[in-house]
A protein has these predicted regions:
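A structural boundary/capping signal
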Residues: 1-173
Length: 173
């Protein structure tokens, strides 16, 4: 029992160093600074849950993307598309901002967000970005003071929306 405890402590000391090295490799893999956000989320997940299998993350996102893709029509306006995506995620699937326990670490670990359907602005925005990537929607993240939101990069006018507030569409003011 004591050996098992010592081994566990050694592993817990090694894992953060390995993850830091992997984050460094990820950052260097794209000199333009546009590195793979999904890989970064997986590394972050391993920091909080080192023994958890992360392959289910991509599978869960693929399934959600398949479901929402069937609901979006090609002739919809960008605003209608965003409304359909956010209605699917925040009303049909029940994702929401964790307003009660905002600082719960599980709000930052993506598998926990998918399981609990609760997150913080950046993880819920990442969810929209990941689904957008899978179904061909130009959704990117936007950092604001005190908040992280998502933007649909429309050719006519960008559409800003707040995943933490159930996808509420925002004005540019």
């Amino acid at each position: 029992l004591k050996i098992k405890s010592i081994a566990s402590e050694i592993i817990q000391a090694i894992i953060p160093r390995q993850l830091l090295r992997q984050f460094g490799q990820l950052a260097k893999s794209s000199p333009s600074g546009h590195w793979n956000l999904e890989k970064g989320v997986i590394l972050l997940q391993k920091f909080g849950y080192p023994d958890e299998e992360t392959s289910s993350l991509s599978q869960s996102l693929d399934l959600l993307a398949k479901e929402v893709s069937a609901l979006i029509e090609h002739n919809q306006s960008p605003e209608q598309t965003i409304q359909r995506l956010t209605r699917f995620l925040f009303f049909e699937k029940g994702f929401e901002g964790n307003q009660i326990d905002f600082f719960d670490p599980d709000n930052t670990y993506f598998l926990r967000v998918l399981d609990r359907r609760k997150g913080i602005p950046i993880t819920l925005s990442a969810l929209c970005i990941f689904l957008g990537q899978r179904i061909g929607l130009p959704i990117v993240g936007v950092g604001l003071p005190g908040r992280y939101i998502a933007k649909y990069e429309s050719l006519t006018q960008p559409i800003y929306f707040d995943p933490f507030d159930k996808g509420r569409i925002l004005s540019q003011e």
